[in-house]
């Protein structure tokens, strides 16, 4: 691919990446609000679970969220810059060392729990309090 084509492609991708989501990593518990179209109406559906993996590839970036629904593990891959994602909220920060948490698929119950990163939680709380003082 020529340099001109790469430049045009990079400019197009930069224009498509419109909004910023909050920063989250593997092990974090997030709530992803997804736009769901049913017939002629649209509603927002919440999907809460643990981020088990992320893929950072510019416009093709994605993240995988795993939750337990009625005793079964359900995983869903979301495109980071997709129009169907309404918002993402980080509920709690997990403390993990692995890049991909695929080992959670084989664990059940208490074994599948992830320790909370208390330092990150304290920083987030301080940031929220500072923002509240500004308002």
UniProtKB/Swiss-Prot annotation:
Keywords: Ribonucleoprotein, Ribosomal protein
A GO CC annotation given for this chain: cytosolic large ribosomal subunit
A Pfam family matched in the record: Ribosomal_L19
Family matches, as Gene3D superfamilies: 2.30.30.790
Single GO molecular function: structural constituent of ribosome
Cystine crosslinks: none
InterPro entries noted in UniProt: Ribosomal_bL19 (IPR001857), Ribosomal_bL19_CS (IPR018257), Ribosomal_bL19_sf (IPR038657), Translation_prot_SH3-like_sf (IPR008991)
Entry annotated with the keyword ATP-binding: no
Domain of life: Bacteria
UniProt xrefs under NCBIfam families: rplS_bact (TIGR01024)
HAMAP family: Ribosomal_bL19
Purpose of the protein: This protein is located at the 30S-50S ribosomal subunit interface and may play a role in the structure and function of the aminoacyl-tRNA binding site.
Descriptive protein name: Large ribosomal subunit protein bL19
Originating species: Xanthomonas euvesicatoria pv. vesicatoria (strain 85-10)
Lineage: Bacteria, Pseudomonadati, Pseudomonadota, Gammaproteobacteria, Lysobacterales
């Amino acid at each position: 691919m020529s340099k001109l084509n790469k430049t045009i492609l990079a400019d197009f991708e930069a224009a498509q990446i419109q909004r910023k989501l909050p920063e989250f990593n593997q092990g974090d518990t997030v709530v992803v609000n997804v736009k769901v179209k049913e017939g002629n109406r649209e509603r927002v559906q919440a999907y809460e679970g643990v981020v088990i993996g992320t893929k950072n590839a510019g416009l093709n970036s994605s993240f995988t969220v795993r939750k337990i629904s009625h005793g079964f593990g359900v995983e869903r891959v979301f495109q980071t810059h997709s129009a169907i994602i309404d918002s993402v909220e980080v509920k709690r920060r997990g403390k993990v060392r692995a890049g991909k948490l695929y080992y959670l698929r084989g664990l059940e119950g208490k074994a599948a729990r992830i320790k909370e990163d208390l330092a990150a939680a304290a920083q987030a709380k301080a940031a929220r309090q500072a923002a509240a003082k500004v308002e």
